[in-house]
Amino acid sequence: MNLMRRGDFLVIAHRGYSDGYLENSREAFEAAIATGADLIETDVRLSSDGTLYCNHDPDLERVRGTDRSIAELPDESLDELNVLRLSDVLEIARDRVGVLLDLKLAYRDYPVLVHDAVSAQGMQSSVVFGVRNVAQAQALHQRAPDAVILGFLNDRSDFPAFFVAGGGIARLWEDETDATSVAAARAGNHPVWITTGQRKDGTAGEIDEARLRRLIALEIDGVLVNAPHRALALRNETANLA
């Protein structure tokens, strides 16, 4: 799969098929793959033992019923709580689907650590590394010039510097997406992916048909959605009408 391609409206399953299954679970990822998603998306954090685990929030209260944080728990406890390791997610995806990693820690060399773990499993060509700032993009590009890097940047004005640093894909939120913001984020001919839903109200990944059609009309290159089957059906319908 060409993870940098433009114009195909890639469907990325946000935390897996999280509309119908527990987010970041094996079941959610398997369902997303079975539905035909182009990529699955997951969040990457470090345990107290230094192992990479997949969970969106810093703690496990919302999905596992404990307010303990990933960072303070050892591997044994996280495994008992059925939190997937990054290595587990990569094996689920191997030879089946691309993977977008949302790297939740903001220190400069964190993407390098994650890239080394991905490379150890021989999966680097199937992974998009989602970084939080320009410094992370620069560090990863220096370590792995061929890595595909997406920017989960808070400030859209940082995208030009992000691309100079080696970034390849711009991510915008749906509620800040219009023709002007897309053109600015593209900075020439870079792909733009959209996290659907709203930035601050807990609806990330949620979207209806009318809003999906608006994004298609804006020639967005990828969408992060909780229910990938809806976006896939609309993409197929649009392609058949072309």
Question: For each predicted feature, which ranges?
Answer:
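Phosphate-group recognition and catalysis centered on beta-loop-alpha active-site segments
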Residues: M1-A242
